[in-house]
């Protein structure tokens, strides 16, 4: 079942807030299975002040975090995980393939490939204009 979530609905599912909420909207959500979200990267992002002042580039770790937040929406939408928090359990096979700069629209896609109990794995891909900017296998654990 596809769902659209605006920023207020996202904030009801995950606990992240400014300046660390890195997802603006969710355009596709299959609870417990997959999600697609977007981050509009603007020149006003706090991290561009120091990364890098003369050539602003979104830090790769924040792209991974944005992917994880979309993954958290997917897993925490499952009835048994509502109201809980998804924590990183690990990051495997992370690759950064394209710079993300002010003006880019970051498409954040995750497919949850395995869930066992409160732990799981997701295949995550971030793209800009259809080109892969980053990808990784994300491991997570759901806690209180």
Swiss-Prot record:
What chemistry does it catalyse, as a reaction equation?
Answer: a (3R)-hydroxyacyl-[ACP] = a (2E)-enoyl-[ACP] + H2O
Q: Name one GO cellular component term.
A: cytoplasm
InterPro entries recorded for this chain? FabA_FabZ (IPR013114), FabZ (IPR010084), HotDog_dom_sf (IPR029069)
EC annotation from Swiss-Prot or TrEMBL: 4.2.1.59
The places in or outside the cell where this protein is found are: Cytoplasm
Give the GO biological process terms.
Answer: fatty acid biosynthetic process; lipid A biosynthetic process
GO MF annotations, alphabetized: (3R)-hydroxyacyl-[acyl-carrier-protein] dehydratase activity
Keyword terms of this UniProt record: Cytoplasm, Lipid A biosynthesis, Lipid biosynthesis, Lipid metabolism, Lyase
User: Where is it chiefly localized?
Assistant: cytoplasm
**Active-site residues from the entry:** 51
Please give the NCBIfam families that the UniProt record associates with this protein.
fabZ, PRK00006.1
Q: Which family does it belong to?
A: Belongs to the thioester dehydratase family. FabZ subfamily.
Cited function: Involved in unsaturated fatty acids biosynthesis. Catalyzes the dehydration of short chain beta-hydroxyacyl-ACPs and long chain saturated and unsaturated beta-hydroxyacyl-ACPs.
Recorded protein name is 3-hydroxyacyl-[acyl-carrier-protein] dehydratase FabZ
What organism, scientifically named, is this protein from? Answer: Clostridium botulinum (strain Langeland / NCTC 10281 / Type F)
Q: What lineage, starting at the top, does this entry show?
A: Bacteria, Bacillati, Bacillota, Clostridia, Eubacteriales
